[in-house]
């Protein structure tokens, strides 16, 4: 039996490798870890606690807010504000960014962007959901209020990113730019413990994840790629397997471990795609690149996109490098940015 290493111990050990580290990022990750435990507890008893279902209101995306969406947003907001390591937060559930105004917070150097509960519409049927987070250094002067520009940074400036998947077991996966590590929650001791060290995504996979019910709305490049995935060819081990849960965190997590590609393209009714660049696509892109994979909008690197709006959307292709490369080749050959279903 190997020695159990908690996430806290792992982070402190890594921090010791950098003598100039101040410990602020370590404390920030601890706050996220704490909030994840609280949210996990509520998800596990959701059917008994009258917090399943809709609030009857819509968030800024025009999506009906689930009760747990609101709960998770408040828990992460409270945890991030409490210790003062964050000067502001942007969330899928908030129309504008949130500024933390304590003296300690105003002098902190980090901002967090978060999707507090991805896939929450699946909770009623007991399907896995998750939390996605992204951390940047602010660009505004410490001591002053946080600004929109602090959040509108390209993904290549992220200092950390990760997700929590609340499933048959609860797991937190994160990167600080030095590889990807996963920690499984042990409820008997109340700690996330190292279970997946130095995760590497297979260069090639056999799984494609996309909502094929929207096929008629897809750009031609995606349609051609799907046909390629479904064709029989022993040399390339096709046809591939279609697996789509409908929760970005769950689909991404499976493909990260097993190899595969997740696609949410533009469509005739959503020319800019559906997924949010800043707090869904960029953090997953940082993770997959650190694990040896690739993330694209179909034509170029996701993390090189300069954001212009807090809730900006983008088409998304993420997963095993060779699969994303091949999907991009189909997009370049059969689609263009000018087509109504391909405007990124």
Curated annotation (Swiss-Prot):
- In short, the EC number is 3.1.3.11
Any one GO CC term of the record: cytosol
Q: Which residues bind substrate?
A: 118-121, 211, 244, 274
Superkingdom = Bacteria
SUPFAM superfamilies listed in its UniProt record: Carbohydrate phosphatase
**Subcellular location as annotated:** Cytoplasm
Q: Which residues form a coiled coil?
A: none
User: Which catalysed reactions does the entry list for this protein?
Assistant: beta-D-fructose 1,6-bisphosphate + H2O = beta-D-fructose 6-phosphate + phosphate
Q: Which residues bind Mg(2+) 2?
A: 115, 118, 280
Binding site residues for Mg(2+) 1: 92, 115, 117
Relay the cofactor remark from the entry. Binds 2 magnesium ions per subunit.
Cofactor(s) demanded: Mg(2+)
InterPro entries referenced in this protein's UniProt entry, alphabetically? FBPase_C_dom, FBPase_class-1, FBPase_N, FBPtase, Fructose_bisphosphatase_AS
Provide one Gene Ontology biological process annotation: fructose 1,6-bisphosphate metabolic process
Metabolic or biological pathway: Carbohydrate biosynthesis; gluconeogenesis
Pfam families, alphabetized? FBPase (PF00316), FBPase_C (PF18913)
Keyword Hydrolase annotated: yes
Q: Name one GO molecular function term.
A: magnesium ion binding
Mind listing the UniProt keywords for this protein, alphabetically? Carbohydrate metabolism, Cytoplasm, Hydrolase, Magnesium, Metal-binding
Please name the HAMAP family in this protein's record: FBPase_class1
Q: Which PANTHER family does the entry mention?
A: FRUCTOSE-1,6-BISPHOSPHATASE-RELATED (PTHR11556), SEDOHEPTULOSE-1,7-BISPHOSPHATASE, CHLOROPLASTIC (PTHR11556:SF35)
This protein's assembly is summarised as: Homotetramer.
The family note in this entry says: Belongs to the FBPase class 1 family.
Please give the name of this protein.
Fructose-1,6-bisphosphatase class 1
Could you tell me which species this protein originates from?
A: Aeromonas hydrophila subsp. hydrophila (strain ATCC 7966 / DSM 30187 / BCRC 13018 / CCUG 14551 / JCM 1027 / KCTC 2358 / NCIMB 9240 / NCTC 8049)
Which lineage is the organism of this entry classified under, starting from the top rank?
Answer: Bacteria, Pseudomonadati, Pseudomonadota, Gammaproteobacteria, Aeromonadales
């Amino acid at each position: 039996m190997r020695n159990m290493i908690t996430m806290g111990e792992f982070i402190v050990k890594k921090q010791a490798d950098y003598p100039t580290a101040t410990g602020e990022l370590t404390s920030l990750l601890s706050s996220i870890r704490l909030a994840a435990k609280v949210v996990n507890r509520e998800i596990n008893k959701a059917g008994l606690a009258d917090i399943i279902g809709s609030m009857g209101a819509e968030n800024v995306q025009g999506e009906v807010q689930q009760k747990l969406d609101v709960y998770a947003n408040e828990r992460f907001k409270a945890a991030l504000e409490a210790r003062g390591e964050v000067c502001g937060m942007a969330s899928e559930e908030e129309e504008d960014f949130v500024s933390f105004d304590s003296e300690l917070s105003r002098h902190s150097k980090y901002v967090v962007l978060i999707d507090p509960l991805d896939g929450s519409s699946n909770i009623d049927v007991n399907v896995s959901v998750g939390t996605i987070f992204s951390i940047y250094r602010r660009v505004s002067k410490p001591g002053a209020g946080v600004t929109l520009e602090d959040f509108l940074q390209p993904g290549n400036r992220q200092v950390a990113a990760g997700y929590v998947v609340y499933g048959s077991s609860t797991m937190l996966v994160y990167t600080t730019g030095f590889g990807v590590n996963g920690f499984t929650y042990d409820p008997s001791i109340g700690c996330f413990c190292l279970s997946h060290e130095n995760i590497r995504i297979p260069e090639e996979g056999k799984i494609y994840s996309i909502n094929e019910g929207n096929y008629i709305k897809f750009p031609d490049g995606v349609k051609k790629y799907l046909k390629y995935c479904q064709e029989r060819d022993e040399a390339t081990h096709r046809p591939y397997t279609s697996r789509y849960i409908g929760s970005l965190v769950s689909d991404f997590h499976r493909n990260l471990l097993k190899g595969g590609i997740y696609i949410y393209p533009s469509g005739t009714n959503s020319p800019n795609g559906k997924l949010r660049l800043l707090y869904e696509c960029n953090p997953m892109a940082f993770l997959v690149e650190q694990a040896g994979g690739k993330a694209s909008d179909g034509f170029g690197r996701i993390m090189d996109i300069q954001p212009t709006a807090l809730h900006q959307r983008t088409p998304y292709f993420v997963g095993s490098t060779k699969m994303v490369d091949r999907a991009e080749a189909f997009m370049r050959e059969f689609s263009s940015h000018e087509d109504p279903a391909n405007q990124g």
